[in-house]
């Protein structure tokens, strides 16, 4: 009897040269981690594909999870048979029947080696005849058919499929280093975090809470966002910085029109310190050019110069509708639209500066002890750990930075 399996296709990983095996192993580990809730028998490499086999009938449900793992270009629900033509022809009938509505079809056979006596053309003809008998009202169409039945002869086995779903693509998480992301409970920053994860980066979010000036609702929502990104994108640690009191100090010390810029310079500076602790090489934000007052070119430059580490803005050229569409796709939109007071809405000026002058920014920056504030916030920072196979905590964290406090993961909340 043909076994149901998942064939995982990859694109960018396959373009790698001598490092290809390294990327494949990372992707395989990430697929295993994403399928922790499933009864997986094995995850293995076979001639340009990753094969996932199961102890139970779970392939259909597992395919929906696999396609969310960065690095996966496509997932095909396949039947695994031996080289007996009767078996793989019967599997082809099953595969085409499960495809859904169609009027035309084509068979595409491929051999990874030539030790099988039948050629690809022979297999095409053989399987095509059986399908024509099974579906007499359907027509064979060589160009642009509704359904394509693939027959792959690989390493002594045959894999047959017609259904194939697009994955998120990109590179496997853990193949491109570590970044710190400024993660709020809003719409933009979760999308920016996901986009960097899709390029292979291990993301370490830092959330600036309005606590104690506001409730900690946003902290719960950020944790929900992290869970929503899983299991495809697994985040191992969330840093929470209670920023409310410092915002209040800035609001009474600095010119009102420059408050937001001062807030963000402090946030970037704290994130940079955490990046050094974590061994991260960049900061990631959800800024989109011109979307709000703080995201004009002048204001971005005024904030950016507070840190030396690179700042990535993957959404900089996206409009709001594009960002919303992506948030809906990755499952964070509904969480991000829940009302929650946070540091982004706390002590906001009526007329924020939209074209900040650096001289004025530097003067405002010297009106308060920013170094002391950064150190104070770092001492008040807490972190929450989540299940992740890609995140590696800094080994010297507790010895060199005992001020950082671990906090238990919040469970269910109202």
Give a label for each model feature.
Residues 292, 298-414:
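Short hairpin/turn module used for nucleic-acid contact or packing/dimerization
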Residues 126-131, 164, 169-176, 247-248, ...:
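Active-site adenylate/phosphate-handling loop in enzymes that bind or generate adenylated species
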Residues 1-180, 190-237, 305, 353-358, ...:
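RNA-binding accessory domains that recognize and position tRNA/RNA substrates
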Residues 48, 241-245, 288, 340-349:
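A glycine-rich phosphate-binding loop feature that marks nucleotide/adenosyl-phosphate handling sites
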Residues 5, 235, 280, 341-343, ...:
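Active-site lining segments that contact anionic ligands and/or coordinate catalytic metals
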Residues 181, 205-207, 240, 285, ...:
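Structural beta-sheet core signal
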Residues 226-253, 340-342:
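A conserved beta-strand->alpha-helix junction
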Residues 186:
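Conserved G/P- and acidic residue-centered "switch" motifs that form tight phosphate/ATP-binding loops
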């Amino acid at each position: 009897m043909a076994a149901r399996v998942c064939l995982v296709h990859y694109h960018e990983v396959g373009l790698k040269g001598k490092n290809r095996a390294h990327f494949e192993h990372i992707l395989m580990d990430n697929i295993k981690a994403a399928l922790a809730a499933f009864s997986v028998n094995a995850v293995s490499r076979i001639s340009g594909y990753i094969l996932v086999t199961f102890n139970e009938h779970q392939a259909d449900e597992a395919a929906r999870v696999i396609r969310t793992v960065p690095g996966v270009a496509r997932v095909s629900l396949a039947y695994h048979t031996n080289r007996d033509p009767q078996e793989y022809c019967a599997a082809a009938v099953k595969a085409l029947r499960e495809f859904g509505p169609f009027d035309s079809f084509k068979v595409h056979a491929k051999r990874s080696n030539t030790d099988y006596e039948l050629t690809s053309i022979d297999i095409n003809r053989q399987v095509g005849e059986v399908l024509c008998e099974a579906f007499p009202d359907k027509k064979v169409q060589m160009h642009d058919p509704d359904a394509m039945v693939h027959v792959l002869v690989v390493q002594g086995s045959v894999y047959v499929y017609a259904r194939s779903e697009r994955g998120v693509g990109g590179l496997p998480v853990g193949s491109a280093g570590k970044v710190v992301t400024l993660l709020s409970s809003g719409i933009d920053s979760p999308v920016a975090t996901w986009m960097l994860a899709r390029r292979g980066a291990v993301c370490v979010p830092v959330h600036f809470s309005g606590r104690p000036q506001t409730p900690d609702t946003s902290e719960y929502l950020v944790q929900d966002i992290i869970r929503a990104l899983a299991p495809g994108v697994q985040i191992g640690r969330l840093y929470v910085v209670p920023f409310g009191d410092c915002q209040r100090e800035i609001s009474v010390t600095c010119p009102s029109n420059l408050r937001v810029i001062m807030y963000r310079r402090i946030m970037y500076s704290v994130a940079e310190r955490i990046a050094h602790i974590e061994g991260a090489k960049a900061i990631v934000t959800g800024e989109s050019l011109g979307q709000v007052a703080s995201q004009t070119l002048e204001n971005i430059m005024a904030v950016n110069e507070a840190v030396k580490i690179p700042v990535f803005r993957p959404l900089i050229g996206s409009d709001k509708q594009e960002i919303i569409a992506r948030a809906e796709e990755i499952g964070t939109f509904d969480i991000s639209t829940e009302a929650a007071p946070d540091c982004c809405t706390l002590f906001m000026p009526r007329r924020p500066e939209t074209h900040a002058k650096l001289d004025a920014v530097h003067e405002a920056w010297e009106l308060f002890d920013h170094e002391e504030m950064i150190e104070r916030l770092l001492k008040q920072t807490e972190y929450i750990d989540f299940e992740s196979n890609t995140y590696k905590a800094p080994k010297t964290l507790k010895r060199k930075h005992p001020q950082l406090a671990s906090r238990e993961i919040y469970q269910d909340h109202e």
